[in-house]
UniProtKB/Swiss-Prot annotation:
Main localization (coarse): secreted
Protein name per the record: Melittin-related peptide AK-23-1
Protein's cellular compartments: Secreted
Sites of Lysine amide modification: K23
Tissue specificity comment: Expressed by the skin glands.
Keyword entries, A-Z: Amidation, Secreted
């Protein structure tokens, strides 16, 4: 379960970074 959470986090990080850069 923890591995899946880490994978989802790693997958969502680029989106968060690009969202922050757009501000």
């Amino acid at each position: 379960a923890l591995g899946g959470v880490l994978k989802a986090l790693a997958k969502g990080l680029p989106s968060v970074i690009s969202w922050i850069n757009q501000k």
